[in-house]
């Protein structure tokens, strides 16, 4: 885990090293100061030597300034290094997620990925900043202070060695009890993020059904679980400070007692025993040693908290994308023909491996228009998502242009397959910015032509700023039908060999739907078009109509053929046209 995280330090190695070097300088000055104080007392104050007092006072002042300077510079370098580390780590994680296939994202869930990119990375950033300072400062301080203390009086310094094991055992007990709690807390954070995202995404539904209290209870329940777990962890961590203080006061008390007796016994003569200045130095070193141990305990606390975050981040970084571009990949798509050969497919997460598509056999010639209908849960969307290789089949093969999609360069394949998903997504920015997702180099004329085909140009022209109208996040300031038409125009700008509309005209009226299909037939006759729809009118003029039921193609043919051979198709047709004869002939 540590090795993987260290890869994200990169250009921040220099700042990290400088932070550790300067903090070492701070430690040196801090260890020297008690020795200078001892000399000031023993050789200046006790002997009344004002010249020596002034000289040592200046040295002490310079040492304190040196300590202050090194500490401040170290803090600056540590802040830069930790911020850069967090930036690199977030970039590495985001880049990894961008290369995930849908199945990888299904495994983690969106809320969990967001938590890892935010909360977990922030925990690691704080821990890294503490490590490059405290993990250097505290051990050096403890070692240098111990050496200096033993140089003054080895017997009295044994007190420190007796106290350290007590601290180590106490810290081990605290850490082992709190780590499992923090693991549980971060899993609960994922649930909390999921509830918040779901609520904000569906806030209009929540308010229209007056379900604010219900959503509040859901949020409160999860938040309460986090509170209880954190309380348990903090109750364990609360023992850390009292344990440190107990050891520190015990050391000071023992040093004072035995040190005072030694001074009395030798008459304050450093040559035969211990001087007053040396005792004060020992007390200073006792404080420094125990404070350094307290710093180490804080590091262990942070490591306990961030260990779970580190494991979660590394899990995301180590995840291998299920779908990748193969070696010697095919770099061009010959045409828009599509073949399904004995295809079976199941989702790895959420369906327990149960196939959602079974034994699909189909040939679609280039330039054909294919309609797909079926009830809810008949796997219509799953069927078309295999064409641009958003998922891989379990058995069989899907071919585009006569070549297995698994042999294509992913960018090449998906560049020639435009898909308007069932859930239409627009991004914050102008209409023109959103449309250029289809082709970032598209001219204004090309953009307008695509919108005319998608029947979007008319309503865009009604906006005061036209194509420069700003779209709010998620497209909340345009209607559902307008959003669908903008997404269709965006797909058309790709100039694809295959165009897939996954129930993408459900929010437009039948007349506009017919105009869109008419424009397709006239303007892009050589593009293979797959139209998933709930309305028979949207597909009845297709060259081939597929009827899916429970993950299988139960019927296939033209509208007239299916009216004769498919009970399911005929039932849907009659239910939609009953009492509405115009709908039957909409075109």
Predicted region positions:
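A short amphipathic helical element positioned immediately N-terminal to and/or at the very start
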Residues: 1-11, 113
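Transmembrane helix-loop-helix hairpins at lipid-water interfaces of multipass membrane proteins
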Residues: 10, 16-73, 77, 150-155, ...
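An intracellular "coupling" helix at the cytosolic face of ABC transporter transmembrane type-1 domains
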Residues: 11-13, 99-103, 119-132, 136, ...
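Alpha-helical transmembrane segments of multi-pass membrane proteins
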Residues: 15-16, 63-82, 129, 133-140, ...
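Juxtamembrane helix-loop junctions of ABC transporter transmembrane domains
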Residues: 21-22, 29-42, 63-110, 114, ...
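Short intracellular "coupling" helices and adjacent cytoplasmic loop segments at the cytosolic face
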Residues: 47-48, 83, 91-115, 119-121, ...
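ABC-type nucleotide-binding domain
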Residues: 332-587
């Amino acid at each position: 885990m540590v090795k993987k995280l260290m890869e994200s330090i990169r250009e921040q190695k220099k700042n990290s090293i400088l932070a550790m070097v300067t903090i070492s300088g701070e430690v040196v000055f801090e260890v020297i100061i008690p020795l200078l104080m001892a000399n000031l007392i023993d050789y200046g104050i006790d002997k009344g030597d004002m010249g020596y007092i002034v000289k040592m006072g200046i040295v002490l002042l310079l040492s304190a300034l040196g300590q202050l300077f090194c500490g401040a510079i170290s803090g600056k370098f540590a802040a830069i290094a930790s911020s850069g580390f967090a930036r690199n780590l977030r970039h590495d994680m985001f880049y990894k997620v961008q290369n995930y296939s849908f199945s990888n994202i299904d495994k983690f869930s969106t809320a969990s990925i967001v938590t890892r990119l935010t909360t977990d990375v922030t925990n690691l950033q704080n821990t890294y900043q503490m490590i490059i300072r405290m993990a250097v400062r505290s051990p050096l301080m403890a070692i240098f202070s111990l050496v200096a203390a033993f140089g003054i009086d080895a017997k009295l310094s044994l007190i420190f060695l007796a106290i350290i094991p007590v601290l180590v055992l106490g810290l081990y007990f605290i850490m082992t009890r709190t780590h499992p709690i923090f693991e549980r807390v971060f899993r609960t954070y994922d649930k909390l993020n999921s509830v918040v995202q779901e609520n904000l995404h569906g806030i209009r539904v929540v308010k229209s059904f007056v379900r604010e209290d219900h959503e509040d209870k859901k949020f409160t329940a999860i938040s309460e679980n986090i509170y209880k777990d954190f309380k348990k962890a903090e109750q364990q961590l609360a023992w850390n400070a009292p344990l440190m203080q107990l050891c520190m006061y015990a050391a000071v008390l023992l040093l004072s007692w035995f040190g005072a007796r030694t001074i009395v016994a030798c008459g304050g003569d450093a040559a035969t025993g211990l001087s007053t200045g040396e005792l004060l130095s020992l007390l200073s070193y006792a404080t420094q040693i125990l404070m350094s141990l307290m710093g180490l305990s804080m590091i262990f606390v942070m490591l306990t908290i961030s260990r779970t975050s580190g494991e979660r981040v590394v899990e995301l970084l180590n995840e291998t994308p299920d779908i990748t571009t193969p070696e010697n990949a095919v770099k061009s798509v010959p045409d828009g023909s599509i073949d399904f050969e004995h295809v079976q497919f199941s989702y790895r997460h959420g369906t327990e491996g149960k196939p959602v598509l079974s034994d699909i056999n189909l040939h679609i010639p280039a330039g054909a228009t294919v309609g797909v209908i079926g009830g809810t849960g008949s796997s219509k969307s799953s069927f078309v998502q295999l064409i641009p290789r958003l998922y891989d089949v379990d058995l069989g093969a899907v071919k585009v242009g006569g070549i297995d999609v698994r042999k294509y360069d992913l960018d090449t394949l998906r560049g020639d397959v435009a898909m308007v998903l069932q859930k239409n997504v627009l991004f914050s920015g102008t209409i023109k910015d959103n449309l250029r997702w289809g082709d970032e180099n598209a001219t204004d004329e090309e953009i307008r032509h695509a919108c005319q085909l998608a029947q979007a140009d008319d309503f865009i022209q009604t906006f005061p700023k036209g194509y420069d109208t700003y779209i709010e996040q998620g497209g909340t300031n345009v209607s559902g039908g307008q959003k669908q038409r903008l997404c269709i125009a965006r797909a058309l700008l790709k100039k694809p060999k295959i165009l897939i509309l996954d129930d993408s005209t459900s929010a437009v009226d039948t007349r506009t739907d017919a105009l869109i299909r008419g424009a397709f037939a006239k303007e892009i006759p050589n593009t293979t078009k797959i139209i998933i729809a709930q309305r028979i009118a949207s597909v009845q003029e297709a060259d081939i109509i597929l009827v899916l039921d429970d993950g299988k193609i139960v019927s296939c043919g033209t509208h007239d053929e299916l009216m004769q051979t498919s009970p399911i198709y005929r039932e849907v047709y009659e239910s939609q046209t009953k009492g509405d004869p115009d709908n039957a002939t909409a075109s």
